Amino acid sequence: HGEYVHTETGKFLTGEQRALFVNGNIVYNGRLFKEIFFEPASPSSSFELKAVTIGRNFHWQRQEDQCFKGAFNLVTGENGIVVINQVDVEEYLTSVISSEMSAQASKELLKAHAVISRSWLLAQIEKNFRLGRKEEKQQNCYRDNEQLIRWYDREDHNIFDVCADDHCQRYQGITRASNPIVQEVIHETRGEILVNGETICDARFSKCCGGVTEQFEHCWEPIPHSYLTALRDSRETTFPDLTQEEEARKWIHSAPNAFCNTADKKILCQVLNNYDQETTDFYRWKVFYKQEELAELIHRKSG
């Protein structure tokens, strides 16, 4: 949609282009590359990727065609070609808040989402910068005589800032922002972030929950964050000690009142994208494993 420029040759491109991954190289127009750069010929130029996998390793995994703006480059990955979209923060957020939630959600919800997602993004970029400068060290495994604690997926992205799927934040292209309110929201919150002292908050969010949030250090990395503590997802603020087995069992086998525990189709249609509405048991659910599946899972996760 519009022209792009292949930066190495200066050639203007329109229409369908094809690149193949062969023996660790990108084959494009009969030549081998490790990386290829494309720049938009105008701000209105956009490109479409075919059969993009979304919801990777989740039960809603599927493929869809997606359209993006901005520059992009193709890079050789371990198992194929990686597409990296170079886009500014506010353009990125326009897609994120209408990919994670529906563009038809209320304006105030989308504004809150924009601030949270902007904060999370900048916190990750800042953290990666510190790690790159070796100002901060990241440890992924802790072991003593009684326990092994292993943290996963924290170093998955070393050639780009964040991925486009649920592992980071959904970034599913410009067509998701179907409501003009999305652009208004990004404009009105431009540059707004959450801070704790002089530090950008590593803000986290979820569409569904179990009725109580977990402390940051028990989910993401063993560093307490005073602004990400255990809270009840309800007007009622008290909850049992869920570190106790019996209390946790009672909580899980019941369905306490919670903001995220709703079956109101009007609300769900307003805030969720179509494929998210396919899942109805998002507050309490069951998963069944065979004995050999559990054994394999424990072996894989424990190393």
Language-model regions, residue ranges each:
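Conserved, single-site charged/polar hotspot
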Residues: 1-303
